Structures are given as structure tokens and as C-alpha cells.
Amino acid sequence: MDKLSYPMTLFNENDYLLLNICHAGRCEVELSPGTYVYMSPGTLNVSASPPKSSYCYPGGHYEGIELCLDLRRLKRHMPEALTDYGLTFEVLRRYTEEGNVMASLTNAGIQEEEKLFRMLREGHSSVYELRFAALSLICHLIGGDAQKIDCGVSITKGQRRIATEAEQLMTNDLRERYTIEELSSHFGISASAFKKYFTAVYGKPVSQYMREKRMEKAKELLATTDESIGEIALASGYEHQGKFGSAFRDCSGVSPLEYRRLNRKTSEEL
């Protein structure tokens, strides 16, 4: 499980309302000490905790937005730009009293999030434009464009360890294939429990997750190496080149050779 860390020295002693919005991928949320749930695209986590110094992203990919409101400063002085939109200190404080909450964005909320995300990614907007877009998003979220949802399947630290160690075992060498029975036996649990833990962390069944990982590896090798299709098939976990070609075509819409030709051409043009 990939982990991203960064210094957060400014956030140690203050009182915050933290809004985390998942745009793509998955992000781990510690719902309570030792209990974890996972954000997926279009979900929001609201908490009274200060920003963390690191986050875990199952699958190694995550895109999202984190908005942090300093409630101590807002209690001393609430800007008119916020109160004009109905964001009083009392309204914000009410959200912190609910603890760690998961919510699902409505279509309007998703549109506001996508707008701010696009502005941040493109990097052409002024700080004032970004502030306005962030304020608009906060107003939508607190104004009703995020609906509280059940947190779904939560897992313990030990259950998370089983899922992440199994993922590492399966992805370290894609040429090796493991059955659910082999994996569950290795960790001393039932097959149904293993599947539950893995899906809770990675958001999809083992078979789908590994198929996507194999195709990612194949695409990388096709675009960056001169290895033969047969060699790439083996490196991706397929003993038979024909089965590999069929699986690759189902995934990408083109044959391995066509994918290599198209991506080599794109690389040369760049």
C-alpha cells in the first residue's frame, strides 16, 4: 500500500474542520483507532482532526482535494465572504460534533469538485479564483450537496495487514499466480473472509484487481521495451500468447502490436 508523507508543522495545535474529497483512486480513513474504511471517487470524509502527515493509498494511485478550516481563527473573526453564504461558526462547529463522517457527493457537488480539481491541475488560475472555487465547493458540501452514507465494510489493522501483504505477494512477480484458496490458507483464514478483506481495501475482487495490474504491466513493457509479445505475455502472467492477446484486446480495444505501434509513435512525437 503506497504511503505519501509531507511536513505538516503548522497544523499541530489548532482546531480544524477537515474536508477530504476523493477524485480518483482510493484513500484510507481511520474511522476510529485501529478501524479503517476506504474512500472511493465521489465520496467525502468530514472530520475534526488536524491534517495528517501521511496517507495510505491502496493500489498506489489517488487524486483528491483536502480543504482545511481553522476554527479557532474563524471563531475570532468570521469573514463576511463566508457568512454571506450561510457559513457561520455555529454551522461549521456542528459538523465537528458528529465526529468522523463519510458522505457521498450529489451531481452538483461532483461538478464543483471537478471544477476546482481541474483548476488546480491546470495551474493557470489566480489565488483569488482558487479561493472562490474552494468557497463555492464548501458551500455546496455544507449546503446539502453531500449526503451522509454508511461507511461500508470497516476492517481492523490485522485484517488490513492480510489484504496488503497478499497484494504485495501477488504483484511482486506477476508470473506467479495464486488461487484464493492458497492465499486464504497462507494467512489462516477462510476464503470468504479473505475476499471480504481484500475487496474492502482495494475496492474490487482479487481477479479484477490482478487482471488490471497485469494489463498495466503489459502496457508499460509494450511502450518502453523491445521485448517480444511472447516475453511480455510471460512477464504479465500469461503462459499462452493467444490468451494474453485476447485479454489485452478486451482491456484496451487493440492488439498488443497495435498498442505498441500507437504508443511508440506518440512517444517519438513528444
Question: Model features per residue range: what roles?
Answer:
Residues 4-18, 60-62:
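A short beta-loop-beta micro-motif enriched in histidine and acidic residues
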Residues 130, 170, 194:
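Conserved hydrophobic/aromatic pocket- or pore-lining residues that grip, position, or stack substrates
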Residues 189, 193-194, 208-211:
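Aromatic (often tryptophan-rich) hydrophobic motifs at membrane interfaces
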Residues 2-4, 23:
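Aromatic- and Gly/Pro-rich donor/ligand-binding loops
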Residues 193-194, 198, 243-244, 248:
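Short hydrophobic/aromatic patch on the recognition helix
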Residues 164-182, 199-241, 261-270:
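Terminal helix-turn-helix DNA-binding modules in bacterial transcription factors
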Residues 12-28, 67-69:
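Short, conserved beta-strand element in jelly-roll/cupin
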Residues 28-158, 163, 180, 185-191, ...:
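Alpha-helical bundle regulatory/interaction domains
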